[in-house]
């Protein structure tokens, strides 16, 4: 049979080879679309993976944790508990504050959740206390998310109450209006108010009760509609001096008349302009300040949002008096930008390394140019798809593109190497391009779809990990797909136009030396392959040994969740004695801040004490430590944390808990440490028994450090035990007693002053400047219906007891959280196993439910799905290869290369001291797609040699190994060098990228050494097996 002319070949590439103008313009269109998409893409640290989270805050000044739980938190929880799509509800009820955090399923829209939350709050309104001064408010942000920017506002001349007023009316509202801002909170705010400090002795002398004062003030300060009327010719609106606005006017307010003389408020109380809440304070580097924490809206472009705020700051500063300064303390986007810049540099470095590898192997500038064009074209074209899919430029998508650098060039290398082989044999460039491209087309398709098949399981991963890596997988898949298109269109077209025999035959000293070197390497490989094929069972034993070793290494390697990043910001919690006073806590906070500011790596510190949505009690203070840029410090964040904790340990009466701020936040509450473990039961008393016991046992474990719990039942409680019979005889009711105590000690908000721009409160309290301990309680006097004054001591006894500082719930049941960090030298998996073992040994009661929270819970879920994820990737690739080859056997041969990659990756992780975390797992899955390329290129040529040239399986696979050795080595080196920049990352966020690079380099080195020998042996083994299965069983007569 006469062989057809090559001009009739070309397969899917034929049209593009013969139409160079159309091919060029198509590539230009891809390039332009990618550039436009890149300019429009948002920039972020990680893909948008936030759970829809809403925080509901209710303030009830003066209420104890028990009162907050029963009267505020429980009614709201009951309504929230019936909402669909609710994943978890946690609450914290402390003195004067109830904070409920609602975390919804990832599939639920935040806007839908917001509507449900508002409806639930409305439904609970009638069940809440009637004197609740503030209705429940909600925010569509995760309280555990660190702010994207932190501002400090200080003043050298103005009181903080005036500064607060300006912030609320001028600054906070303007920043809240910036696109992308989700919430602006003021920490340490000193809202102005009129404080009425009652004199118990003066009240008693006039025969007055605190309730009569409260009633008089409430009645005297009103702001209600008064109507209007029409006269004969005009309409008149009514107004009156029904409001009291100044402190002097309040002093002159008449409470009652005694002996025909007025009793004014100043006669029984001190009235002054003062902060609404005197137990809130914040500092910036030890200077009293109001801290503005700015949190982003879910899904917002964090870089654009921060830029808008920065552009707005000069205008805001100009609107303030000169004595008021706005200082930028922290900007999360600084490290995000630096991290993205580092990855972009590593991407460019990877491209340069890959191009260098291509030149070393092809040894021709023109031949190097052709596959080198495929790299930027494939990567830039991917940006267009990323834009239409709603992705962002972040660490993971840039990591995907960096790894793709080694992938996208592979196809072009395979094509150009095959075409160049025919040109070197003397064929015309056009004929060689048509013949070479047509011959290799199926291989390119096999390589592309089998590699994309590996990524398919990543798309179906559930929960937050699936969301996190979806952008990674799709970005990588799109770049691989575009590279295949480029390799089947542009690459052969350029080969036909640019390559010729003279250019390829041109040699210099470098090309001749490198040619001799490659010839020697191929000859050495051929001799080694001959020996290996003559001893197949030894090689097969090695292959089986790698599989066994992979399983063993997976069992023993430490397992983690997500690498701890150094983003230059540390969150801190200062914990003091449960009975500490506010003023003493201020002193402790200053001591800790002083010690931190002395550290040379610290740039600034903001601190806060008081009860708000993130801080549950007065005995804990919050810190945000901003480190100097990487260029100004040589130490990583964990080293700095260890040193700061050692310095704080010298301060008596406090414990300092520190953790680095992370890009990925799964938790729903601000914690002292990175990881949490909760106990949940019906009984608070049972928690009080077992939480301290378990905490004490966990503190003994070497795998853990910074172990603590939020169980605090040592608060000082003054229990007023009323003799009800005696009180009734004297005409005193429990309502009067509660009201008198609330008026005296609750910072009770009794009235509101309305202005054109803001509202201010009138606060009632008892003035007891020189009293200590429980003495102020002995000054309480009550007035019965006949006007008689009844001392509280005559109807009640005061007992000092212990009580809880906060009551925590998870899904409406009492709970307590044990926080911990992983000790150096251990992984999160070690810590989880140690906790589970300790829990089992202690034999907790069956009605106590234990559960890991946040990152640890996600780690457990990821750990159980890891094996299935790898299995799913292998099965998906087997199915694709089986369909492409129409064979059950050949896919098994190709997949036999995988254990070698697993061994190399796991050994590299162990040698480098890294744990097997989610990033490393992704690296192993990518290796599954890469290392099988070697087998595909060998088997494709072997099958073609058997089918078209009638070679024996031995001759076919032997020739395929030698012919494909150089492209196999070239593609592997390209993939390996694309991962080298990630492996040696040192900049911001390097902890996130390094495990991927380590896995890729270790797996590729090991697989490259072994698969060149194991694949042909297994190919021949399965070929013999297939022949035996196909050979018919001989008949009895034939046997004889």
Curated annotation (Swiss-Prot):
The keyword Ubl conjugation does not apply. It is found in: Cell inner membrane. Signal peptide: none annotated. InterPro entries: AcrB_DN_DC_subdom, Acrflvin-R, Multidrug-R_MdtB. GO terms for molecular function: xenobiotic transmembrane transporter activity. One of its GO terms (cellular component) is plasma membrane. Its main location: membrane. SUPFAM superfamilies: Multidrug efflux transporter AcrB pore domain, PN1, PN2, PC1 and PC2 subdomains, Multidrug efflux transporter AcrB TolC docking domain, DN and DC subdomains, Multidrug efflux transporter AcrB transmembrane domain. The chain crosses the membrane at residues 16-36, 342-362, 373-393, 396-416, 440-460, 472-492, 537-557, 865-885, 888-908, 911-931, 968-988, 1002-1022. The keyword DNA-binding does not apply. PANTHER family: MULTIDRUG RESISTANCE PROTEIN MDTB, PTHR32063. HAMAP family: MdtB. Belongs to the resistance-nodulation-cell division (RND) (TC 2.A.6) family. MdtB subfamily. Part of a tripartite efflux system composed of MdtA, MdtB and MdtC. MdtB forms a heteromultimer with MdtC. This is Multidrug resistance protein MdtB. It comes from Musicola paradisiaca (strain Ech703). The gene is mdtB.
